[in-house]
């Protein structure tokens, strides 16, 4: 995908949301793309799903507001804009933004990436099906990746929170 395609895709996007948290963090969280709340605030994961994400990582002693590399998380998305009608990013959009995501990862140098949902699994692992992938360590962009259910999914399917807790505990074990 050439730069002309990137420029065309970004031309009509009013808000570009890149990252939040301490770039020195050992853990990078990669979401799918901004939603309505993120579009309004200009930061990733600020709506109900973001509040759940904060509670999830607080349960293992991590926070997006900490400057301590050992206690912080760094958050970004596969695509930095809200797709029209809040749809999932298309395969073309994912492929278009993949070089930027890879470079972002290379610059941040996380020890672990948490891939939140199908779109981030597709981008990082080139696989879909977070239900099958979750709970198993994989490698993406040269970094250990833990696929997890997206917090928005957990809000719709509270019974999956038990599996998400197991995944968080695996992340906690890996960083100790």
Region spans (language model):
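A polyanion-binding, active-site-adjacent surface
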Residues: 1-176
């Amino acid at each position: 995908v050439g730069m002309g395609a990137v420029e065309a895709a970004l031309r009509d996007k009013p808000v570009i949301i890149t990252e939040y948290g301490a770039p020195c963090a050992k853990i990078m969280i990669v979401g799918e793309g901004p939603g309505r709340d993120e579009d309004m605030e200009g930061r990733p994961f600020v709506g109900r799903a973001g509040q759940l994400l904060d509670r999830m990582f607080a349960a293992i002693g991590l926070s997006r507001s900490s400057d301590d590399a050992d206690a912080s998380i760094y958050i970004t998305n596969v695509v930095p804009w809200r797709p029209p009608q809040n749809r999932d990013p298309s395969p073309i959009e994912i492929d278009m933004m993949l070089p930027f995501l890879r470079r972002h990862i290379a610059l941040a140098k996380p020890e672990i990436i948490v891939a939140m949902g199908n779109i981030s699994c597709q981008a990082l692992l080139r696989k879909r099906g977070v239900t099958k992938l979750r709970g198993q360590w994989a490698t993406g962009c040269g970094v250990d990746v833990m696929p997890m259910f997206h917090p928005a999914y957990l809000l719709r399917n509270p019974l999956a929170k038990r599996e998400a807790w197991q995944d968080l505990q695996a992340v906690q074990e890996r960083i100790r």
